[in-house]
Design a protein with these regions (language model features):
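The conserved beta1-alpha1 loop
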Residues: 35-42, 190
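Alpha/beta-hydrolase active-site loop
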Residues: 79-103
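C-terminal catalytic histidine-bearing segment of alpha/beta-hydrolase fold enzymes
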Residues: 210-268
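Hydrolase active-site cap/lid region
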Residues: 121-165
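Cap/lid segment of the alpha/beta-hydrolase catalytic domain
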Residues: 40-88
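N-terminal cap/lid segment of alpha/beta-hydrolase-fold proteins
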Residues: 1-31
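Gly/Ala-rich beta-loop-alpha elbow adjacent to hydrolase catalytic centers
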Residues: 111-120
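The feature captures the conserved acid-bearing segment of alpha/beta-hydrolase catalytic domains
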Residues: 146-207
Length: 268
């Protein structure tokens, strides 16, 4: 499920900003004023690896601004890197959104997976008001999820970190002040069998978003672990994006949990 986009459908941004720890690449839709999707890859995954998923979103009629992030965000065992990464990416996203607006784009959504989901969780509301709808492809507690990655946990232990210290260091990122989210629409994609970011871990984070005015739902997918949960969400990305984009129509209530398990049978 890989391949390349044709000439003229993409524009590359090759320069990696060392202090920011990310790289971006733009994939153009056929129409200049098509909605734009901010797409952030999972931890340790490159844009080229997920070109197949990006291509599916482009074919559905969206510009895609894709990002990949440095593995140092976890492997360097320095919690400040995540904070700096989020700050740097916010600034870049604001710049890219401003540029796209000047080119005629008026709608902006997002699709973030795993670490990418958490970064975007810290970019909604007052942080970047233009992001009013989008998909969190897995979600939960960033410190607990990272601690479940054996290699990353060992690296942090070597540097004197414990889970409680990490939770304290990232508390303000885990519980951001959104401001008002009136009219915003978001969905979390998850699986009961995801051992890194389990479905049941999402519930505590729905309340603050709803209290801020957002419509938030949880979509359960059929998977056997964290990676397959991510892939299931990526495979269904065009349909899931349509669920949250205003004016696309949603057939079920937004207050509860939905399941895509039967619909995705036979796929990752």
């Amino acid at each position: 499920m890989s391949g390349d986009l044709g000439a003229g459908q993409r524009a590359r941004h090759r320069d990696l900003v060392p202090a920011g720890g990310y790289r971006s690449e733009e994939f153009r839709a056929a129409s200049r004023d098509s909605p734009a999707i901010i797409f952030i890859c999972p931890y340790g995954t490159s844009i080229s690896t997920l070109r197949w998923a990006i291509r599916r979103v482009c074919r559905a009629g969206y510009h895609v601004m894709a990002y990949e992030t440095t593995t140092a965000v976890f492997m360097a065992a320095d919690p400040a890197i995540l904070r700096d990464l989020i700050s740097a990416m916010r600034k870049d996203l604001e710049s890219q959104i401003s540029r796209l607006r000047s080119e005629g784009v008026t709608e902006f959504g997002f699709f973030g997976s795993s670490l990418g989901s958490f970064i975007l969780y810290n970019c909604i509301g007052d942080a970047i008001p233009a992001l009013r709808w989008g998909v969190f492809n897995t979600g939960g507690d960033i410190a607990q999820g990272m601690w479940r990655l054996d290699g990353v946990r060992r690296q942090h232990v070597r540097h004197g970190w414990s889970l409680p210290r990490l939770e304290a260091a990232w508390a303000d990122l885990q519980w951001p002040q959104f401001g008002r989210l009136d009219g915003c629409r978001f969905v979390f994609v998850s699986s009961r069998r995801d051992t890194i970011a389990p479905l049941d871990d999402i519930a505590p984070y729905l309340g603050p978003m709803r209290q801020a005015g957002a419509q938030v739902s949880v979509l359960e997918v059929r998977a056997i672990g964290h990676l397959t949960t991510i892939v299931a969400g990526l495979w269904q990305a065009p349909r899931i994006i349509a669920m949250v984009r205003p004016g696309q129509g949603v057939s079920r209530p937004w207050s509860g949990r939905r399941s895509a398990r039967r619909r995705s049978r036979g796929r990752p």
